[in-house]
């Protein structure tokens, strides 16, 4: 099992934290365990409440069923069902990015 450093940030929310996330744990779950308050609703990858923008790195979000290929290519990531597959940086609180 690998563990990756995941930077979660949003200037408007005053958030800039780096947490360690095992490759078998969802990013949202690890953030909550670290005491961070990130937005979410369904926790099943079926809505956009937890959407973030992947700025660096890679994730596996194959459990989600909401984002289309274009939205994923644009960097959208549903943190409730995303596993890190490398060190990464995610701009959180970005439900507004889904068009």
Curated annotation (Swiss-Prot):
Biological process, per Gene Ontology: electron transport chain
Domain annotation 2Fe-2S ferredoxin-type: ranges: 4-96
The protein's required cofactors: [2Fe-2S] cluster
Entry note: cofactor: Binds 1 [2Fe-2S] cluster.
Keywords: 2Fe-2S, Electron transport, Iron, Iron-sulfur, Metal-binding, Transport
Similarity comment text for this entry: Belongs to the 2Fe2S plant-type ferredoxin family.
NCBIfam families with a match to the protein in the record: fdx_plant
Protein name, as recorded: Ferredoxin-2
Lineage: Bacteria, Bacillati, Cyanobacteriota, Cyanophyceae, Nostocales
